[in-house]
Amino acid sequence: MPSKWAGIQSPKILDALRVALSDDKEFSHGEVVDLIRAALDDGILTPGELNDLQIVAENSETMLARAKTMLLYLIEQTRNLYGTDGQFGLTTMQERYAAEIICGFLKRMGTGYFPKLDRDRVGIDLLFRIGNPEIMNQDTLGICGPIAFLYGLASDSPRTYAQYAVDLYDNGKARIGNIVVAPSKGCRTYSPPSSMSPADWLAAASLRDSDNWWFDVDDIKVGFSASSSIGDIEKWFVQAGYTDVESKGNLVSGLDPRDINDLNRYQGEGRRVVLRINSKMLYADTQNETTYRGNHVVVLRSPINRTPQGVQLTVFTWAQGEFKVPQGGALSEKDFLGNLYGYVAGKPF
């Protein structure tokens, strides 16, 4: 191997380099995707392998600009998410199968039906989400319902999540079980805020827009019109293939103590549980305030612990998979239930 590759330590990456350069000494975009695939072959992308990939990106004289940008984005985002000493992992066969779907997507050309979304950024962000769905984030857009549903989908069936997202991008429509998602032109041609992942916009905004009879989800100012009811989420659960789906909702008043028993039972049975709450519950200075409607959707990540002081639980919300409630002092059971407006629970497929 040429001396410019002398610093590369990973046998996997060295082998992939030899294959890529064996024919014409040039790096095609597809060969760079294969390099990423090789690095993920054992399901782990280590800090050392990231350093090796950076050597390739910085020293190759024949790598196309698109491929170099994609590779550097992968390196940058991995370090942003996991730190310089952290590593990205795909721990299950389902996750690795989903990664194969995404690598195939990365090899293709063009912007598909979403001209404002870069294919390679979408693909790399999808890779991160099948390995760690907790990074999903709706940013300022009121699509917490779809994000909560897709968090569950990516956790329970990463293959289904990956296929859904790449089909959306390439075909302008996709299926999740019996859900047919066909977003409007306004949604497909919208440029989301730079602070939001294009993968999250693609998957979540399309789901909400396709099902929204009120407004197109093509403007972050839409707000409440983009939010999802318990009925919407229950329908997604059932049509996606979740079984033993149970739901309860109240538009203007909270639930009652028996619902905590039911939620803990569903959690213990391994069901995916989504809660519709008022977001004031999530902040120390407002958690005990009276509210009159739900305005946010979170995923229950722990049993609801009852103590003499009040309740304690963990939820997924806004890219935080282990968000503790309460954030301030004690949250009484009464105040918790007063901010809980519904739930959906179902067994993963």
List each model region and its residues.
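Hydrophobic, aromatic-enriched interface-forming segments
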Residues: 217-257, 261
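Low-complexity, glycine/serine/proline-rich disordered segments
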Residues: 1-4, 55, 59-109
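Surface-exposed polar/charged interaction patches
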Residues: 19-24, 38-41, 56-63, 77-84, ...
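Active-site signature of cysteine proteases
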Residues: 243-349
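Acidic, glycine-anchored loop motifs typical of Ca2+
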Residues: 6-37, 41-48, 54-55, 60-69
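Stable alpha-helical elements in mature extracytoplasmic
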Residues: 31, 49, 140, 145-149, ...
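Extracytoplasmic/periplasmic, Sec-exported soluble proteins
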Residues: 27, 45, 136-141, 225
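Active-site nucleophile-adjacent alpha helix/oxyanion-hole segment immediately C-terminal to the catalytic cysteine
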Residues: 83-219, 244-245, 260-276, 308-311, ...
